[in-house]
């Protein structure tokens, strides 16, 4: 019987709750304005801390009525203010609540309310707007829809500490793109917000600081302007340095360090400046220590990784600051063993941040080890480091996988590591698995790493070859992403270097001549350069040159002609002439050049070019064609003499460039022998 009674009981309780909520909404429609005001005040008291009540009132249609009352010119200022306060309270509920408020067009209504002159009403509207805008479900673009909004918000900054706090918080949350940065910059964000950094209110100082961190991120224009800003006679960078002092709240230290990091990365502060080397870097290393909260350690590590990414000196300094390399190993120890955690909340917290910690540690290791051999050695010798990277490659979190492969890529730049750690841990296996099915950003990093693993001195090259990687790499060359096409062809180029004939034939077969020639006309110069590099490596020993040219000679000569005639860089043309020199070294392949007078004229033209690199490559080509010890050399020498090549060679023996002069003399000796 109890089961039968339960349902009706539930319904009656629900009806009661709904009836109470309905009563609040009904009072908003009372014809007596005084009753309406009292109804709004009672509603305000009823919803404080009561998410269920908030949801009920939203479902029952309270929001459109509150917005109507807020916008009515006939409403008293007190009523309008109370409506804004209730809406602010409703917005502090769940994400669904905020979605409903946004759908009811709360944002334009509140922005309109800011045109009122009454400060208390303005503050109530701003407080609600702040809560709505900092929610992840609110489209930030809504702040920028009406072009008059940003300048009006700037003008309200001087009204009170509350307007300063709410407006800077809105800006800090809604500045997500370079376009947003530009809008705020153009409307005077820097000069309006800078004085707030010395406000007596901590909240105002903090939000102003956050504003500068999002404005300066990857923005040279903002960063260059910030360097010259004075706040109460003090340079802004020095204000940030003061905010990083150990006695300041961690949130402030971290955000100030971010501001200086972003200004440095944007080129506004030199990496060797004291405020970076002696202040920002040590502050960020401190943020990585065990004493800090997990989320602070994540932010500290990621910011530090970004700061030193392009600078080898900062990497070296960081690697010997506070045992950073071993300190980061601790990032992998979360969540702690379950038995040691009695607090379930703590376990939940650790689990939530474990992925982020691993991701941050991998990013920082990648940045630390991107240039210096000793640092890479230090990283790989850290406890279980290679095992951690390997397991990171197969984590469920895509961000951790990306950070792990980025770390692996950084370490793979080391010849020593490729020969030792990478081989010992068979890193190529999980890497190949990752390449089978991953988003493009992971594929780009994984294929870059694979390029390094396929270098001729890498012990991983052989097992990778045997695993059927050629087909995979050929498929990458057909990608829409130019970065993936570059990496696919680059890996094939490394694979073809000093490879045996079997591998070369397999590459040509798998790639297909059509695709090879498509890559030779790729709009991306990097793709073209690597494809030429592949071709040069394929055509590298006489039997290989003759075999490939016997089956694909016509198309290769055609491609060479097109490139030499086209609008290409010196590097591209030099690489193409080197391919021609390789063809000229073949036993039978050289006839493809000798029977092509048009090609010979092109070589002649490049021997007289203003660029020494092109002259060298073209002269090398002729040198190979007239080499004495080969069959038919006399006929070739005679033909080239008739075409005027000897006169050019003679002239080049007087060249100012010693290499060109030597190469021309070597060629001339073939005629004298």
Swiss-Prot record:
Keyword annotations from UniProtKB, A to Z: Cytoplasm, Nucleus, Repeat
Keyword Cytoplasm: yes
One cellular component term from this protein's GO annotations in UniProt: cytoplasm
A biological process from GO: animal organ development
SMART domains for the chain: ARM (SM00185)
Keyword Nucleus belongs to the record: yes
Function: Component of the CTLH E3 ubiquitin-protein ligase complex that mediates ubiquitination and subsequent proteasomal degradation of target proteins.
Protein name: Armadillo repeat-containing protein 8
Gene, per the UniProt record: armc8
């Amino acid at each position: 019987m109890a089961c039968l009674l339960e349902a009706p009981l539930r319904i009656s309780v629900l009806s009661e709750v709904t009836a109470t909520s309905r009563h609040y909404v009904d009072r908003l429609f009372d014809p007596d304005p005084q009753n309406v005001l009292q109804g709004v005040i009672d509603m305000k008291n009823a919803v404080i801390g009561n998410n269920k009540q908030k949801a009920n009132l939203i479902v029952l249609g309270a929001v459109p009525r509150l917005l109507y009352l807020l916008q009515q010119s006939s409403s008293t200022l007190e009523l309008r203010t109370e409506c804004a306060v209730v809406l602010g309270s409703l917005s502090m509920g769940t994400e669904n609540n905020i979605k409903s408020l946004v759908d009811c067009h709360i944002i334009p209504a509140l922005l309109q309310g800011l045109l009122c002159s009454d400060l208390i009403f303005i503050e109530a509207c701003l407080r609600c707007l702040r809560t709505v805008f900092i929610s992840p479900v609110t489209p930030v673009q809504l702040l920028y829809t009406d072009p008059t909004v940003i300048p009006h918000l700037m003008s309200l900054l001087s009204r009170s500490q509350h307007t300063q706090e709410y407006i800077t918080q809105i800006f800090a949350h809604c500045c997500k793109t370079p376009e947003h940065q530009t809008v705020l910059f153009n409307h005077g964000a820097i000069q309006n917000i800078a004085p707030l950094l010395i406000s007596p209110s901590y909240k105002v100082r903090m939000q102003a600081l956050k504003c500068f961190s999002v404005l300066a991120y990857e923005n040279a224009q903002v960063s260059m302007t910030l360097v010259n800003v004075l706040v109460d006679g003090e340079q802004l960078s020095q204000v940030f340095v003061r905010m990083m002092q150990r006695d300041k709240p961690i949130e402030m230290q971290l955000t100030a360090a971010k501001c200086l990091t972003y200004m440095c990365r944007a080129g506004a502060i030199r990496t060797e400046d004291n405020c970076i080397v002696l202040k920002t870097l040590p502050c960020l290393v401190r943020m990585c220590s065990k004493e800090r909260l997990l989320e602070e350690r994540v932010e500290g590590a990621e910011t530090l990784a970004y700061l030193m990414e392009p600078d080898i000196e900062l990497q070296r300094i960081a690697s010997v600051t506070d045992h950073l390399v071993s300190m980061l190993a601790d990032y992998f120890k979360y969540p702690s063993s379950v038995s040691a955690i009695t607090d379930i909340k703590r376990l939940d917290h650790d689990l939530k941040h474990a992925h982020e910690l691993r991701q941050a540690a991998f990013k920082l290791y990648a940045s630390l080890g991107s240039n210096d051999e000793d640092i890479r050695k230090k990283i790989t010798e850290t406890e279980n480091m290679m095992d951690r990277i390997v397991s990171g490659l197969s984590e469920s979190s895509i961000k951790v996988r990306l950070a792990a492969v980025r770390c692996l890529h950084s370490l793979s730049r080391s010849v020593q590591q490729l020969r030792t750690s990478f081989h010992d841990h068979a890193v190529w296996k999980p890497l190949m698995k990752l390449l089978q099915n991953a988003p493009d950003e992971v594929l780009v990093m994984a294929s870059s790493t694979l390029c390094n693993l396929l270098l001729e001195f890498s012990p991983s090259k052989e097992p990778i070859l045997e695993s059927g990687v050629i087909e995979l790499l050929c498929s990458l060359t057909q990608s829409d992403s130019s970065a993936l096409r570059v990496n696919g062809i680059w890996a094939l180029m490394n694979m073809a270097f000093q490879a045996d004939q079997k591998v070369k034939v397999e590459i040509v077969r798998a790639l297909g001549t059509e695709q090879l020639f498509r890559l030779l006309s790729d709009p991306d110069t990097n793709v073209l350069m690597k494809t030429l590099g592949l071709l040069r490596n394929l055509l590298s020993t006489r039997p290989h040159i003759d075999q490939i040219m016997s089956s694909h000679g016509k198309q290769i000569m055609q491609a060479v002609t097109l490139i030499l005639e086209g609008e290409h860089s010196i590097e591209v043309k030099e690489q193409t002439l080197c391919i021609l020199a390789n063809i000229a070294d073949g036993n039978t392949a050289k006839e493809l050049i000798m029977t092509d007078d048009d090609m010979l004229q092109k070589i002649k033209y490049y021997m007289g070019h203003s660029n020494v690199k092109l002259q060298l490559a073209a002269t090398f080509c002729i040198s190979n064609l007239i080499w004495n010890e080969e069959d038919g050399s006399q006929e070739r020498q005679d033909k080239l003499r008739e075409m005027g090549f000897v006169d050019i060679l003679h002239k080049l023996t007087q060249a100012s460039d010693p290499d060109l002069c030597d190469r021309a003399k070597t060629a001339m000796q073939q005629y004298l022998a």
